[in-house]
Amino acid sequence: MHDVTVPDVNIGVVGHVDHGKTTLVNALTGTWTDRHSEEVKRGISIRLGYADATFYRCEKCEGTEAFSTSPDCPACGGKGTPFRSVSFVDAPGHETLMATMLSGSALMDGAMLVIAASEKCPQPQTKEHLMALELVGIKKIVIVQSKIDVISQKEAIDNYHEIKAFVKGTIAENAPVIPVSSQKGINMGALVQALDQIIPEPERDPDAEPVMLIARSFDVNKPGCNWKDVKGGVVGGSLIRGILHADDKIEIRPGRQTQVENRIKWVPITTTITSINAGSKKVETATPGGLLGVGTRLDPALTKSDALAGQVLGHEGKLPPVWDKIRCRVTLMERVVGATSELVIEPLKHSEPLMLSVGTAVTVGVVTNTKKDSVEIQLKRPVCAEEGSRIAISRQVGARWRLIGMGVLGE
């Protein structure tokens, strides 16, 4: 029997900076995902934020009023029945943080595209994030028209038509548009119902070898704590397939960098799982869907400050290969989106530096060989990925990395 309080999917929250993504996650979960001091100061998300919500259905109410993320029904005050939990991945909307958004997209089973009704649609990062969802293959999308409390009904309807015109011909063409006010809690039931219908739990293979994409890693020890109380390093991310158990012997790849006879080598890290947290619950067994915190016996110095973000965790000797040079089939977009002027995208050139997002890993590489639609790239940092993985490709345009297309690894 599935525990309804353990999240079964990850839902990305994407869109332009300051369109209300973090406020929306707070309204749904009660968690403010900007915990980083710099984020609070600047009022923008810098790292990926995570929060879980349980969906409740009230048996007395009908339609959208029956749905909420609160045990007490907001419409009638009766008791709601919990039927499902989800994890939200709050991605930064600022153009300089596109790499962070792309690394988060690897964890997403579906996404909410948040568009503020108070601004003209589309804004630059609204375009860029929708293009990113299209490139990494996220098809299950709910569009959230936010901030409807600060505009008139006519402006909201005009903005709705702008949104529909913008998504025409994209993967979000048939996505529902849900108008909400996160500040006032308006229409949250309709949003919960739409998320439940559009982003169901995907089919999972429980017998597959486990593969967990690491998006965060940390040292949970307080400065100056007694050495007897020191806890091992913790990694956070999402299990994309298979099952993990407490006490499993695991390997993390590419691992850590070492120098052997003046050559840099990457050595896989092996350790044992000491604890697993799914959402805020301690569990013995982890299944795909939702975000996990995995406690290990690693030296916390190895995991502090997201040092292992972008790596892959699984059973010893069973992980996908590690690549320091890749060949991929490339599909480039026609124009650069997200910039003020939309430049035509030129073909990839020999010796050109590129930023590649593979799973949760973000690495830089240099083009060593180009053919008609395939390219070879020498990576600065190796990545652990399966053949056939999708790779988001960005190039420097002006002083920014801009998304220009996608590749398929090893073709």
Positions of PLM-derived features:
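P-loop NTPase switch module centered on the Walker A-proximal segment
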Residues: 1-99, 108
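Conserved catalytic-core segments of large NTP-driven translation/proteostasis enzymes
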Residues: 2-3, 165-308, 312-319, 324-332
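C-terminal effector modules of nucleic-acid-centric enzymes and ribosome-associated factors
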Residues: 10-13, 151-153, 299-411
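Conserved Switch II/interswitch segment of TRAFAC-class P-loop GTPases
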Residues: 83-87, 91-97, 106-128, 134-157
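G-domain G4 guanine-recognition motif of GTPases
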Residues: 116-118, 139-157, 177-188, 310, ...
